[in-house]
Regions:
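Short acidic/glycine- and proline-prone juxtamembrane loop motifs at membrane-interface regions
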Residues: 115-122
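Hydrophobic, aromatic-rich transmembrane alpha-helices
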Residues: 82, 253, 257-263, 271-299
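Membrane-interface helix-loop-helix junctions at transmembrane boundaries of multi-pass membrane enzymes
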Residues: 87, 91, 141-144, 271-272, ...
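Transmembrane-helix motifs of polytopic, lipid-linked glycan transferases
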Residues: 56-58, 70-92, 283-287
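Transmembrane-helix signature of polytopic, membrane-embedded enzymes
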Residues: 85-105
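Interfacial juxtamembrane loops and adjacent helix segments
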Residues: 3-52, 56-60
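Alpha-helical transmembrane segments and terminal signal-anchor/GPI-anchor hydrophobic tails
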Residues: 148-277
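Loop-to-helix entry region of an early transmembrane alpha helix in multi-pass inner-membrane enzymes
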Residues: 43-46, 50, 54, 62-80
Length: 368
C-alpha cells in the first residue's frame, strides 16, 4: 500500500479511503501481495485488519519503515485515549488514585495497547468518544462535536464490531437516563430493545442475522482451536442459531469472561498474569461490596453505564471465544470501565482500623 504512494499516488489514495478499489485490478496489483488484507476466513463481518494497514501506511511516510517509530506513534494514540478516559473518570470522583489505577495501571490494558496492534486505536477512539460525549451531554450543546463523535464511532465499527455493539447501547442508555431516575430500567430496556431490533433486522436482511453470525463465529473459533491444538483452549458447547441456545449459554459465558483462567488451568508461566489480574479485579469488587459508600445520582448513572458496557462486551466474548488468551485480549476495552465502576463505591475509611490508618494508605487518600 505504501509503495503505491510513490509509483501510482492515485491508487494509494483510493486504497487509503476505500473508494473505487473494489475490482480485479487492485486485487491483482496490490491486495493479493499484502499479507493480511484478506483474512484466512471470512465471517461476513467487517475486516478490521485493513484500518490498521492503512494507518501504518500513513505512518510510514514519516517513519521511513522504522518499526519503533510506528510503535511510538500508536503508543501516542493509546495515550491520548487513556488521558481522555482519565479526564472523564475524574469528573465523577475526587480521587485521583482510583482514576490512575483504572486507566493506567491495569497490566493487560497497558500491555495490549502498547504495540502495533488494534487495541491502541481502539483505546484512542473509546477514550476520546467518552470524554467528548460527556461534554456534549453535560456542557453546552455544540454541533461541531457531532461529526467528530460519528468519526470515532466509525473507527469502533470498523476496528472492533463487537465493541461497537456493546458500547453504543450503553452510551444511548446513559444519555436517556440523564432525563429519568429509572436508570436500571432504561439500560435493561435498551438491551432488550437492541436484541429485538437485531431479531427484526434478521427477518428483513437474513445476511445480518446476528445470532447466526455469532454461532458461526464461535464454531469457526472452536474448530480453529482444535485444528491447531491451542494450549489455552477451553471446553465449550457449540451454539445453535436460536435465541434460547444463547440464553442457556449466558451464565457460563459471563463466568468465562469474568473469572478465567482458573488456578487449575495454569499450564505455563504466561497464565499467571491474567490469573492474578482477575483475582485483583474480583478482590476490588468484593471490597467495594463490603466497604462501599453511597454515590450521587450522576455517579450512579455513570456506574450503570460502565457496567452495562462491560457486561455486554463480556457476554459477547464469553459466547464466542473458546481460547483463554483471546478472552484476555478481547476484554481489555471494558476493564477500565469495570474497574472504575467498582472503585466508585469503595470507601477506604470503612476498612478495618489497622488497615485504614496505615501510613501509606493515609498518604494515598490525602494526596491522590
Amino acid at each position: 500500500l505504501y509503495e503505491a504512494l510513490w509509483t501510482k499516488p492515485m491508487d494509494f489514495f483510493k486504497m487509503l479511503f476505500g473508494i473505487g478499489c473494489q475490482n480485479e485490478y487492485f486485487e491483482t496489483m496490490y491486495f493479493d501481495k499484502m499479507n493480511n488484507w484478506f483474512r484466512s476466513y471470512d465471517n461476513g463481518l467487517l475486516n478490521d485488519n485493513r484500518l490498521v494497514i492503512r494507518i501504518n501506511a500513513v505512518f510510514r511516510i514519516v517513519s521511513f519503515g522504522n518499526y519503533h517509530v510506528h510503535s511510538l506513534l500508536l503508543n501516542f494514540l493509546a495515550f491520548i485515549g487513556s488521558y481522555s478516559l482519565a479526564r472523564l473518570f475524574l469528573v465523577f470522583t475526587d480521587s485521583k488514585w482510583k482514576t490512575y489505577l483504572a486507566v493506567f495501571l491495569i497490566p493487560s490494558v497497558v500491555f495490549w495497547s502498547s504495540g502495533i496492534l488494534k487495541e491502541a486505536v481502539l483505546l484512542f477512539a473509546l477514550g476520546l468518544f467518552g470524554w467528548n460525549f460527556y461534554r456534549l451531554m453535560f456542557e453546552k450543546w455544540q454541533w461541531k462535536r457531532v461529526p467528530f463523535l460519528l468519526f470515532l464511532l466509525a473507527i469502533l465499527l470498523v476496528m472492533k464490531l463487537y465493541v461497537f455493539i456493546a458500547f453504543v447501547p450503553a452510551v444511548l442508555a446513559w444519555w436517556i437516563s440523564k432525563y429519568t431516575k429509572r436508570t436500571i430500567l432504561v439500560h435493561a430496556s435498551m438491551i432488550i430493545g437492541g436484541i429485538l431490533f437485531g431479531l427484526a433486522l434478521a427477518q428483513i436482511v437474513p445476511s445480518l442475522n446476528f445470532i447466526e453470525i455469532m454461532a458461526n463465529k464461535q464454531c469457526d473459533f472452536i474448530n480453529l482451536s482444535k485444528a491447531f491444538n491451542v494450549n489455552s483452549a477451553i471446553e465449550m458447547s457449540y451454539l445453535e442459531p436460536n435465541l434460547w441456545s444463547f440464553i442457556k449459554a449466558t451464565p457460563q459465558a459471563l463466568i468465562n469472561s469474568f473469572t478465567r483462567p482458573w488456578p487449575t488451568e495454569i499450564k505455563s508461566i504466561l497464565f499467571f498474569p491474567p490469573l492474578l489480574e482477575n483475582l485483583f479485579i474480583i478482590g476490588i469488587l468484593i471490597l467495594s461490596w463490603f466497604y462501599g459508600k453511597k454515590v450521587s445520582a450522576m455517579q450512579w448513572k455513570f456506574v450503570i453505564f460502565c457496567l452495562t458496557f462491560s457486561i455486554i462486551l463480556f457476554l459477547i466474548i464469553g459466547l464466542t471465544t473458546p481460547i483463554l488468551g483471546a478472552i484476555v485480549r478481547y476484554k481489555i476495552p471494558a476493564i477500565p470501565f469495570l474497574m472504575f465502576a467498582a472503585l466508585m463505591f469503595f470507601d477506604g475509611q470503612k476498612l478495618p482500623r489497622f488497615i485504614a490508618q496505615n501510613r501509606l494508605l493515609v498518604w494515598i487518600n490525602s494526596h491522590l
